């Protein structure tokens, strides 16, 4: 149920603003309870450094500031909303930085692991997949919570041999433990999207559990899932060898297996094997 006072505040903030930009995938959340649940799922502590992607009118930002993290970075591509957040700096005790940038080009790999980084955002549908592919594999973060299109969320948590299982499933499950937190209907946004959204949390896997070459895995996934209905032996015919054949036998997989039949761990092993062949 939408909180009328909260909706009034959000409406006031957007009344004098330019219209939501379709090119930026802007759909502004209007529900106080859902905003609170999304931020609560991030489990913010006093030592955390929070990065919010695309804060817009601040539906999540207000709750993040109330949670009192050590610092808050706002990554905003829209010049209007970046300016609004800069003007509001003096109204909060939380150390806040507003960065006018495209999160797709942000240097996630430069986040130092000596700080507790937490990532959050209502991600635009049109960039959510490539953005999560990068930031959840490159950034040294301790937790992330994103609201995305429900269909994309279903793909992320999908299991092998399911219709939704694909490259994004394997990649993110190789770097994180994703969990679906809640489903959000279109009615709580302005303008309304045409589909449901899902809120997912991500806990990073320890480095000891990521014993694979990210570059090799990324290439392998893109090759395999571009031809997901073909047999792996045919997809990988350029790289097929006695060692690869032996690996399939060891895993109990026939050469006729298709990409969706391999688990994330099996893709990691296969990527390492293929890379070792190429460099030997």
From Swiss-Prot:
Binding-site residues, S-adenosyl-L-methionine: 27, 29, 54, 76, 102, 122
GO molecular function: 16S rRNA (adenine(1518)-N(6)/adenine(1519)-N(6))-dimethyltransferase activity; RNA binding
Statement: the UniProt record of this protein carries the keyword RNA-binding: yes
InterPro entries for the chain: KsgA/Erm (IPR001737), rRNA_Ade_diMease-like_C (IPR023165), rRNA_Ade_Mease_Trfase_CS (IPR020596), rRNA_Ade_methylase_Trfase_N (IPR020598), rRNA_adenine_dimethylase (IPR011530), SAM-dependent_MTases_sf (IPR029063)
Domain of life the protein comes from: Bacteria
Enzyme Commission number(s) from the entry: 2.1.1.182
Catalytic reaction(s) noted: adenosine(1518)/adenosine(1519) in 16S rRNA + 4 S-adenosyl-L-methionine = N(6)-dimethyladenosine(1518)/N(6)-dimethyladenosine(1519) in 16S rRNA + 4 S-adenosyl-L-homocysteine + 4 H(+)
Protein localization: Cytoplasm
SUPFAM superfamilies: S-adenosyl-L-methionine-dependent methyltransferases
Coiled coil: none
Xref: SMART domains: rADc (SM00650)
GO CC term, one of those recorded: cytosol
Keyword S-adenosyl-L-methionine found: yes
Keywords from the named record: Cytoplasm, Methyltransferase, RNA-binding, rRNA processing, S-adenosyl-L-methionine, Transferase
Gene3D superfamilies referenced in this protein's UniProt entry, alphabetically: Ribosomal RNA adenine dimethylase-like, domain 2, Vaccinia Virus protein VP39
Pfam families attached to this UniProt entry: RrnaAD (PF00398)
Family: Belongs to the class I-like SAM-binding methyltransferase superfamily. rRNA adenine N(6)-methyltransferase family. RsmA subfamily.
Function: Specifically dimethylates two adjacent adenosines (A1518 and A1519) in the loop of a conserved hairpin near the 3'-end of 16S rRNA in the 30S particle. May play a critical role in biogenesis of 30S subunits.
Name listed for the protein in its UniProt record: Ribosomal RNA small subunit methyltransferase A
Organism whose genome encodes this protein: Oleidesulfovibrio alaskensis (strain ATCC BAA-1058 / DSM 17464 / G20) (Desulfovibrio alaskensis)
The gene coding this protein: rsmA
């Amino acid at each position: 149920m939408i909180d009328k006072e909260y909706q009034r505040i959000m409406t006031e903030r957007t009344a004098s603003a330019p219209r939501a930009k379709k090119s930026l995938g802007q759909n502004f959340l209007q529900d106080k309870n859902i905003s609170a649940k999304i931020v609560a799922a991030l489990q913010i502590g006093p030592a955390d450094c929070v990065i919010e992607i695309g804060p817009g009118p601040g539906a999540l930002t207000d709750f993040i500031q109330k949670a009192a993290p050590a610092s808050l970075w706002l990554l905003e591509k829209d010049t209007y909303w970046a300016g609004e957040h800069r003007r509001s700096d003096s109204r909060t005790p939380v150390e806040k930085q507003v960065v006018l940038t495209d999160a797709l080009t942000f240097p996630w790999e430069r986040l130092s692991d000596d700080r507790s980084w937490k990532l959050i955002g209502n991600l635009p549908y049109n960039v959510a997949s490539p953005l999560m592919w990068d930031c959840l594999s490159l950034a040294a973060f301790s937790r992330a919570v994103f609201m995305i299109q429900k269909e994309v969320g279903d793909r992320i948590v999908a299991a092998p041999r399911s219709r939704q299982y694909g490259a994004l499933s394997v990649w993110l499950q190789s770097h994180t433990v994703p969990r679906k937190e809640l489903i959000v209907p279109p009615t709580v946004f302005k303008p309304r999207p045409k589909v449901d959204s899902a809120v997912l949390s991500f806990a990073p896997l320890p480095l000891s559990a990521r014993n694979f070459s990210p570059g090799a895995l990324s290439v392998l996934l893109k090759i395999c899932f571009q031809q997901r209905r073909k047999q792996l032996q045919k997809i990988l015919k350029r790289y097929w060898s006695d060692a690869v054949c032996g690996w399939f036998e060891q895993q109990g997989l026939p050469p006729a297996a298709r990409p969706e039949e391999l688990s994330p761990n099996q893709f990691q092993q296969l990527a390492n094997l293929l890379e070792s062949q190429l460099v030997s």
